[in-house]
Every structure is written in structure tokens, then in C-alpha cells.
Amino acid sequence: MSDKAAFERGTDGPKVIVAGLDGSESSWRAAAYAAGLARRQRALLAIVYVQPVLAAGAAFGAPVAEATAEIADELKAEIEKAASRFQSVSSLRWEFHTFTGDPFSGLSQASDELKADAVVVGASEKAGHRIVGSVAVRLVKAGRWPVTVVP
């Protein structure tokens, strides 16, 4: 009975790792952790920023779409700057994606569309999430991907 597939060293890890990034300190730590994991597993790192549908600036007449697009551009520029510093020592494959919606729905959509094998997010820094539930808790409860929460 040699029909069983033989174990191949280095081929059983995740192929796509999604990291949620919103600019908070914990999300940057999560992205760094995910980058290390992706590098070691030779996986694709998909960094995802979810643009909010409504922002506080909308109440004051600020152009919300332009503001959130600007945030996405700034995050991407910071990521590219960090990646260029390590390019000579690492062959990390990464992509930057933006999705629109609330963070849970956006990360869920991204993880589904990108066929994520794992999702990495930062721990919530907002006090209200103790009552409503953080994005990380909601992703875990969805039970569709392994989720790592980085403090």
C-alpha cells in the first residue's frame, strides 16, 4: 500500500498568508510577524487594508474616499520602504490589496478571494471591542481560516 503521498519537506505550509493592516502599532507588528512566517514558508504575503465605507470625516463634509485612498497609499509606501531594506537578504513575495467595508467583512472577503491559508491580525487597541467583539474574535468565530492574533 504505497498509495500514500510521501511527505515532502518544505511543502506542507501555507501558500497565501493574509495580514490585516490599518496603520495601528499592533497591525504593523502583525504584518511583521506575517512577513517572517511567509518568508520561512515561502508563501505569498497579502497585506490587506480595508477602507471604511463611512468615516468620521464624512460628518464634516470631508471627502472620505480620497482620505481613505490616501491612507492606503501611505501604508503601501511605508511597506515598500521597509521591504526595500530587506530585499537583498530576503526573497519575500508580497502584494498590497485594498478592500472596502468594515474590517471584518473586508478581511473575510480578501481571505476568500485570495484563497488564504492563514490570516494574521493585530490585537484590538479599542476599548469598545470588549463589548462588541474585535475583528480578531469575529474572524476566529467565522472558523474559515486559521487566525493568528499578534499583541
Please describe what each predicted stretch is:
Residues 1-12, 84-119, 126:
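Structural beta-alpha unit
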Residues 62-66, 113-115, 137-138:
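Short, hinge-like loop/turn segments at secondary-structure boundaries
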Residues 142-151:
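Short, acidic/small-residue loops that bind anionic groups at enzyme active sites
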